[in-house]
């Protein structure tokens, strides 16, 4: 039985205040041990640009409607004949007081395919977290 799903996608990154997009890799990960989370590592030319942990249900909802407040916001967008998931990520504060910002566009069909694979590992509504293990981990890091 698979307990993990990994997939690498080419996505479009729009960084800063420009409308220009450029391709980067998004390495998606899902582990049954952390059933609510999706991990995304963005890289370009072999260099890690950022690592984010996203809520699986939020990503699913973001395919059909705008969701999120704070650091992560998702919404569906159409670009010509393509349907995309727009992921806005807000980072640390810059010297001028604004926050670092990146927008990533992912082909909707690729996200849906990845989510289907995660659902075959842990079905939505069947997620479980062992509280005792979680508390033991927290106190060990203490």
Regions found by a protein language model. Give the residues of each.
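Short, well-ordered loop/turn elements at secondary-structure boundaries
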Residues: 34-36, 81, 99
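Protein-protein interaction regions
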Residues: 19, 66, 71, 76, ...
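Secondary-structure transition/turn motif
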Residues: 41-46, 88-94, 108
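Mixed-charge, glycine-accented linear interaction segment located at domain edges/termini
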Residues: 92-93, 98-142
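Charge-rich, low-complexity N-terminal segments
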Residues: 1-39
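Short, surface-exposed beta-strand/loop "edge" segments at domain boundaries and coil↔beta transitions
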Residues: 19-21, 44-54, 94-103
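Short alpha-helical interface patches
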Residues: 37-47, 56-67, 112-116
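Short, internal acidic amphipathic alpha-helical interface segments
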Residues: 50-94
């Amino acid at each position: 039985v698979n307990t993990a799903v990994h997939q690498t996608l080419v996505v479009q990154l729009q960084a800063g205040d420009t409308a220009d997009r450029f391709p980067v890799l998004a390495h998606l990960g899902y582990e049954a041990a952390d059933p609510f989370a999706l991990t995304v590592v963005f890289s370009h030319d072999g260099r890690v640009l950022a690592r984010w942990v996203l809520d699986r249900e939020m990503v699913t909802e973001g395919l059909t409607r705008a969701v999120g407040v704070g650091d992560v916001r998702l919404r569906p967008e159409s670009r010509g004949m393509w349907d995309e998931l727009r992921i806005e990520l807000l980072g640390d504060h810059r010297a001028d007081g604004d926050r670092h910002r990146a927008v990533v566009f992912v082909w909707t069909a690729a996200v849906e395919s990845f989510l289907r694979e995660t659902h075959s590992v842990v079905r939505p509504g069947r997620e479980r977290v062992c509280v005792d293990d979680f508390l033991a981990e927290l106190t060990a890091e203490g």
